């Protein structure tokens, strides 16, 4: 009847001549670390195999996608267990076996189950619409790391910082800006970027959500009419011919800097401003944070820059303000992101 690759869930319709036995779904939100669970499956073709263990962790992020929040269990599961139920001791399904972590391919006591609440939400949409519609804000976001929080003068490293806006998207229309830190949605605290993505996804397209935003130290409330998330498509980067390395006209924090030429702006689709990183000292904090030659500094703090001197001035201003690190908005080949770099590095 429908599939949802983002969560690895499919809804099947079975034709049967008689009523089939069913199981009852439970409330996975009530489980705790240490609770006993039972996993059922067909490991290596051995049907109706049952194993037992405990909940090792909840809300586990293993890079399986923005919409999955796995239950980690230590009940032995192997290849063939995927799709089988995970029961609590009341006999209710609290999850569906999904994958294992194993260097050898066999069970090492680290398995993951998709929570029953996720299954319920996805199946309801597959049954009614044949697809899963997710709310869309139209932003590229990052989690607020301790370094980013320090550079912004924030007390807590919670929330999601807006690195880029989709032109014409819901957030852009509502007045969001690069550098805004989203701290809550509809009154509920946002822990990190993944939390925000999941929460926005649950808002129906056309509904309005209210976002608490920290903009340059000031709190704002922004109301956004949520859009329907478009199909995920990977935008291919058009290869550009290699250009001669520009002369270094400035240095800061282990970075060689040069002003962008109009041709370079055109190649990278940058409307105005920007300072090219021409080299990175491999022993610098900038290198540790993943900055590379060819990246482009768009902002230092909240100020757009177009010359190496403006980058240096922004760093000096942050240092004068007592900050140990400075926040850079950097355009890379993969998109825009914020990077907090130690000033002393």
Where are each of the predicted segments found?
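C-terminal recognition in membrane/secretory proteostasis and scaffolding
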Residues: 13-16, 32, 93, 118-345
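Conserved beta-strand positions that form and line the central face of beta-propeller blades
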Residues: 22-24, 70-72, 76, 161, ...
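Short, positively charged
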Residues: 6-9, 60-68, 187-188
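Short acidic/glycine-enriched loop/turn segments that link adjacent beta-strands
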Residues: 5-8, 79, 334-335
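Active-site loop architecture of trypsin-fold serine endopeptidases
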Residues: 19-22, 40-54, 59-134, 193, ...
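Active-site substrate-binding loop(s) of clan PA
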Residues: 1, 14-46, 78, 124, ...
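Residue-level recognition of beta-strand microenvironments
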Residues: 1-3, 28, 40, 58, ...
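A generic structural motif
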Residues: 8-14, 73
């Amino acid at each position: 009847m429908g599939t949802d690759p983002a969560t690895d869930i499919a809804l099947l319709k079975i034709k049967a001549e008689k009523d089939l036995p069913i199981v009852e779904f439970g409330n996975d939100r009530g489980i705790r670390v240490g609770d006993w669970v039972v996993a059922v499956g067909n490991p290596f073709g051995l049907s109706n195999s049952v194993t037992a263990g405990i909940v090792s962790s909840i809300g586990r992020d293993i890079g399986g996608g923005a919409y999955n929040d796995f239950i980690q269990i230590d009940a032995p599961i192997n290849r063939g267990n995927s799709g089988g139920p995970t029961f609590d001791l009341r006999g209710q399904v609290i999850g569906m076996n999904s994958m294992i972590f194993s260097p050898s391919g066999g069970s090492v006591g680290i398995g993951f189950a998709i929570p029953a609440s996720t299954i319920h939400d996805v199946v309801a949409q597959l049954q009614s619409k044949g697809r899963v519609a997710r709310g869309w804000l139209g932003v590229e976001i990052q989690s607020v790391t301790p370094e980013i929080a320090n550079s912004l003068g924030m007390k807590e490293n919670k929330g999601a910082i807006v690195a880029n806006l989709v032109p014409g998207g819901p957030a852009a229309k509502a007045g969001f800006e690069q550098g805004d830190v989203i701290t809550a949605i509809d009154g509920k605290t946002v822990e990190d970027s993944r939390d925000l993505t999941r929460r926005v996804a649950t808002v129906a397209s056309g509904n309005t959500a209210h976002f608490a935003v920290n903009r340059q130290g000031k709190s704002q409330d922004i109301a956004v009419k949520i859009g329907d998330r478009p199909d995920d498509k990977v935008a291919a980067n058009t290869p550009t011919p290699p250009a001669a390395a520009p002369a270094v006209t400035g240095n800061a924090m282990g970075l060689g800097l040069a002003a962008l030429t109009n041709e370079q702006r055109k190649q990278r689709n940058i409307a105005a401003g920007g300072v090219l990183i021409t080299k990175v000292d491999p022993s610098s904090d900038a290198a540790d944070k993943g900055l590379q030659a060819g990246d482009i500094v768009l902002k230092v703090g909240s100020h757009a820059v177009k010359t190496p001197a403006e980058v240096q001035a922004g760093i000096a201003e942050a240092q004068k303000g007592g900050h140990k690190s400075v926040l850079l908005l950097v355009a890379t080949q993969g998109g825009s992101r914020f990077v907090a770099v130690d000033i002393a590095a």
